[in-house]
Amino acid sequence: MVLSGKDLTAYRNEDVLFQGLSFCLFPQQLMTITGPNGIGKSTLLRIIAGLFKAAEGHVSLKDQEQIYPVATACHYLGPQNAMKPFLSVIDNLQFWSAFYGQPLHSPHEVLADIGLSDLEHVPFNVLSTGQKRRIAIARLLLSYRPVWILDEPISGIDSYAQTLLTNIFQYHLNQGGMIIAATHSPLGIPENHKITLEKFLPPQEKIQ
C-alpha cells in the first residue's frame, strides 16, 4: 500500500499556501510536516485526509490491486480533540468505538495504553490539556486504520506522556501503519520523510 500526493496546490482566499508539493509514503514510514504557524500545515493534512480538496493535484492510496479512499483508511487527529466536553472519558471513547465499528481494542484497554485508566469516569472538560490530548490519541487505538494523520499530536504533553505516545506511534509503524504528522516537536522516532512547507511557497514569497 502506497500513499502519495502529486503536485498539490492549496489557496487561502486568493493567496497560494503551497504549490507543486509531492510525496510518497510506504508502510512503516513516518513523514513530518514543518513550518511556522499559518503556513498551511493543517490545510495540507486535511487535503491528505480527504477533508479538503486541493486546488491542483491529487492524493491517492493504493496497492497493486485497487485504490482506496483515504478518508476511510485513515485516523485524522486535528488541533481540537473531537470529544464531547461534558461526557466522561469512557463515554466519549465508547461513542467513538461504536462510530468506527470493527473494534480492535476496548475503551478500557486504550485508556490503559495511555496510562489514564483512573480517569475513565471524569468529565472530559475537567482534564488538563495534556490529558485531553492523550485521550484523543487513545481514540486512534480503538479501530485499526493504516494511515494516521496527526496535527500537533504531542502539543501540551509532558515528557512522561511523550514516552508513552512515542511507543504507541512506533508500534503502529511496526504493524505496517503510516504516520503523517505536522509538528513543532520531534515525535521521538526516526522520520523517513520531511516536508518543509517554506520550500513550496510561490517564488516571490520565497524571496521575501
Curated annotation (Swiss-Prot):
Part of the ABC transporter complex CcmAB involved in the biogenesis of c-type cytochromes; once thought to export heme, this seems not to be the case, but its exact role is uncertain. Responsible for energy coupling to the transport system. GO terms for cellular component: plasma membrane. It comes from Bartonella henselae (strain ATCC 49882 / DSM 28221 / CCUG 30454 / Houston 1) (Rochalimaea henselae). This is Cytochrome c biogenesis ATP-binding export protein CcmA. ATP binds at G35, P36, N37, G38, I39, G40, K41, S42. The keyword Glycoprotein does not apply. It catalyses: heme b(in) + ATP + H2O = heme b(out) + ADP + phosphate + H(+). One of its GO terms (biological process) is cytochrome complex assembly. The gene is ccmA. GO terms for molecular function: ABC-type heme transporter activity; ATP binding; ATP hydrolysis activity. PROSITE patterns: ABC_TRANSPORTER_2 (PS50893), CCMA (PS51243). It is a peripheral membrane protein. The complex is composed of two ATP-binding proteins (CcmA) and two transmembrane proteins (CcmB). It comes from the Bacteria. SUPFAM superfamilies: P-loop containing nucleoside triphosphate hydrolases. Residues 3-206 form the ABC transporter domain. InterPro entries: AAA+_ATPase, ABC_transporter-like_ATP-bd, ABC_transptr_haem_export_CcmA, P-loop_NTPase. Gene3D superfamilies: P-loop containing nucleotide triphosphate hydrolases. Keywords: ATP-binding, Cell inner membrane, Cell membrane, Cytochrome c-type biogenesis, Membrane, Nucleotide-binding, Translocase, Transport. Belongs to the ABC transporter superfamily. CcmA exporter (TC 3.A.1.107) family. It is found in: Cell inner membrane. Its EC number is 7.6.2.5.
